[in-house]
Amino acid sequence: MHKTSPHRNQRLADQIQRDLAELIPRELRSTSLGLITLQSIELSPDLAHAKVFFTVLGAEPEHALKALQEKAGYLHSLLFKRLHIHTVPTLHFHYDSSVEHGIEMSRLIDQAVESDQQDESK
């Protein structure tokens, strides 16, 4: 199995992220998908697979995930034309709930601070 250097792997992941960030809004024009933002790309060591982590604003994550999965093959073929490398990784889309989780944690912290301030003022 051929493995690539971590530096090359990261450069390729960054390039795939830039290209997909340009291709997805153009190729998945449905307004019902909301705003899809690519958070990160994780490549397998042999570059055969790419986990594409995304968030979505203004739409249900499940709906966006389904649309991305349905277009994965087409997006793969478009990447092949752009990247000029022998093997383009197979795309696997994953919803990244960490942003949502962070917002919820921030809300809970704000709520706890407000509650403490109210208790101190009594």
From Swiss-Prot:
Record GO biological process: maturation of SSU-rRNA
GO molecular function: ribosomal small subunit binding
GO cellular component: cytosol
Main location: cytoplasm
Keywords: Cytoplasm, Ribosome biogenesis
InterPro entries, sorted: KH_dom-like_a/b (IPR015946), RbfA (IPR000238), RbfA_dom_sf (IPR023799)
Presence of the UniProt keyword Cytoplasm in the record: yes
SUPFAM superfamilies in the record: Ribosome-binding factor A, RbfA
Pfam family, one: RBFA
Subcellular localization: Cytoplasm
Family designation: Belongs to the RbfA family.
Subunit and partners: Monomer. Binds 30S ribosomal subunits, but not 50S ribosomal subunits or 70S ribosomes.
Task performed by this protein: One of several proteins that assist in the late maturation steps of the functional core of the 30S ribosomal subunit. Associates with free 30S ribosomal subunits (but not with 30S subunits that are part of 70S ribosomes or polysomes). Required for efficient processing of 16S rRNA. May interact with the 5'-terminal helix region of 16S rRNA.
Protein name: Ribosome-binding factor A
Species assigned in the record: Polynucleobacter asymbioticus (strain DSM 18221 / CIP 109841 / QLW-P1DMWA-1) (Polynucleobacter necessarius subsp. asymbioticus)
Gene: rbfA
